[in-house]
Amino acid sequence: MTLSDSDLELITTELGRELTPAEAALFENLWSEHCAYRSSRPLLQSFTTGDDSANDEGAEHVVIGPGDDAAVVRLPRVDEASETPIYITMGIESHNHPSYVDPYDGAATGVGGIVRDTLSMGAYPIALADSLYFGSFDRERTQYLLDGVVEGIADYGNAIGVPTVAGSVEFHNKYTGNPLVNVACIGLLTDERLVTAEAQSPGNKLVLVGNATGRDGLGGASFASEDLSEDAETEDRPAVQVGDPYTEKRLIEANEELITAELIQSARDLGAAGLGGASSELVAKGGLGARINLERVHQREPAMNAMEILLAESQERMCYEVHPDDVETVGDIAAKYDLGYAVIGEIRDGNYVCTFGDETVVDVPAGFLADGAPMNDLSATEPPTPEESTFPAIDAATAFNTIISTPNTASKRWIYRQYDHEVGLRTAMRPGDDAALIAIREAGVGLALSSGAVPAWTESNPYKGAQAVALENATNVAAKGATPIAAVDCLNGGNPEKPAVYGAFKDIVQGLADMCHTLSIPVVGGNVSLYNDSTSGPIPPTPTLALVGTKKTFDAPPAALTGDGTLLLVGHQSNNLGGSELLAQIGGTDKFPALPSNPTAVVDSLARVANHPSTLATHDVSTGGLAVTLAELITSDAGARVTVQNKTSLFTETPGRAVIETTDPDAVRHIFEGVAPVVSLGDTTTDGTLTINIDDEDTANESPAVTTDAATVAKQRRILEDALE
């Protein structure tokens, strides 16, 4: 990738001279789509971010919104009289292209990068969530990528001691040439520990702490701003970073000590565009400049030139602004943790200047470098959405057995059992449920976390599908009794220069923004990843959302039946099958299901039901519809006898619904009165069997439409384990 003629003309006109090679490379990376959001930034104004405290609903929780390394959200407290506010940080990143070229290192360094974004704010990382998207599971290449990505996430996350507690995995043939790896991180801090990525004062020193700089990851930002080529695995390997989790662990602990000692004025991790990106963005945000001596950067490879030192994306490095009086102490702490350390320059008024030997290799206005890229004016065409119902007939038993044994509905235990999800002793609800639940004892609240998207939904109808993604994640945390308070997004799309691709991308942005606004959930930060396009075509528009909610306890009803209650289905239901797993398996098209007109009331009511003492189990209805929800709820000790109105009721994926096991059905009906329908499904049993009757088919037939048991279902849902073990 090189600078376009128009960009080059704009830059040389601004500077009044030709660019040095280092400047050209720096602008190429910082003005890339990956760094500058040239095709998406105007669209992001649709989101309610909480920055406008007077007008944004949900803003009372937002301390720092979009624009920093991570967002900062104030947690509500059980004891409101406490004087110490407790904050969490929220961040999400993509490492899509690197994970195709090198799935292990690509995914591992994705984890490392989002953790360092957390460190930049003065927070300690306490939880990870990973949302992964791959091509058709039956392909050998897909299984290779899945195996490598999961191993990379597990090895890195486990080694640094941060639990991976939530996430999602989706398979769709349009990810075959371009998988997605989206990783979110939650951090914890108090208000006095808060640091930002905004340079504070001229005269302060810039200090580099962490790994030595090598040549790995060169041009990573520009690499992430192009379609993947057929030869990407070999040609683009140098653009993929190599991680060292044990250095990252030492960096986490050193950062904690530096923040505790109040030695850090501002901070930024070295991610996209390396030292050049981190240092220029830090001073630009403060309206300042810097003078950096590149020869002072500690290096692990010989004869590195200025451009390589500036742009290498070697991992496990932090750039700190430090008062001159504190520089020696920072060096002592770095040495204590066996970390590299170098005073590379200082913050000044004026330009961003880098020297190498006796030569000035960069001398540009920091604000122009960081924020001067012009936005793209791209054409967009409205994506077609199905309007007719055309799909083959299929009997309920065949449909049920088909739908519970697909890669998308299969058990993901093979994946999350590789993650240490309990390190840190905060995990109150483990992976495999609707949402994770993390104990924030400092505030006396439980923090529920859900992350994911459903590409079949957004492919069927980008706008409504994105709305459904937001509602689905909100429903997940509500099903565990939590009230949503904030979210971050990772907006993944194909090549935006294709009008159809850009049109669908615009729709997912607007759909996600509209539903989050309706739910009063501020989207406090995020990431955009475009050019997820390859020789096999663009990916489906994929709006990953990581959403948190809070509750006053550290426990929640599980997504597993007890055998002691009545089963109810709560929420509005549409009989359309658009975007469903059933249609993905049997073929055909249908309209996307209608969404509830009162989603906030539905989510609030579900949270109240989940916290009611009569509630024994809760599980939201999502991919695979009610059929999969019921299959996931039964255990060897608890089954169910269920009756539904029609076959479509089993397979529609209308979001905003949940199955409740309760000993007091009237209490559930009272809570949902005037909000959404409450349908009696039947009773639970203690024999581990599931029988489903369908009213409109079985009136003259005494045998159930579906009969199965927990052992059979578990075997059918083992397809990932059977293929990969």
UniProtKB/Swiss-Prot annotation:
Taxonomic source organism: Haloquadratum walsbyi (strain DSM 16790 / HBSQ001)
One Gene Ontology cellular component: cytoplasm
UniProt cross-references to Gene3D superfamilies, sorted A to Z: PurM-like C-terminal domain, PurM-like, N-terminal domain
Biological function: Part of the phosphoribosylformylglycinamidine synthase complex involved in the purines biosynthetic pathway. Catalyzes the ATP-dependent conversion of formylglycinamide ribonucleotide (FGAR) and glutamine to yield formylglycinamidine ribonucleotide (FGAM) and glutamate. The FGAM synthase complex is composed of three subunits. PurQ produces an ammonia molecule by converting glutamine to glutamate. PurL transfers the ammonia molecule to FGAR to form FGAM in an ATP-dependent manner.
Origin superkingdom: Archaea
Binding site for Mg(2+) 2: 117, 269
Active site: 34, 95
Annotated NCBIfam families: FGAM_synth_II (TIGR01736), PRK01213.1 (NF002290)
Catalytic activity: N(2)-formyl-N(1)-(5-phospho-beta-D-ribosyl)glycinamide + L-glutamine + ATP + H2O = 2-formamido-N(1)-(5-O-phospho-beta-D-ribosyl)acetamidine + L-glutamate + ADP + phosphate + H(+)
Gene name, Swiss-Prot/TrEMBL: purL
Subunit: Monomer. Part of the FGAM synthase complex composed of 1 PurL, 1 PurQ and 2 PurS subunits.
Residues that coordinate or bind ATP: 37, 489, 526
UniProtKB keywords: ATP-binding, Cytoplasm, Ligase, Magnesium, Metal-binding, Nucleotide-binding, Purine biosynthesis
Principal location listed in the UniProt entry: cytoplasm
Protein name, as recorded: Phosphoribosylformylglycinamidine synthase subunit PurL
Region called Disordered, residue ranges: 220-241
Cystine bridges: none
PANTHER family, A to Z: PHOSPHORIBOSYLFORMYLGLYCINAMIDINE SYNTHASE SUBUNIT PURL
Enzyme kind, highest EC tier: ligase
Documented EC number(s): 6.3.5.3
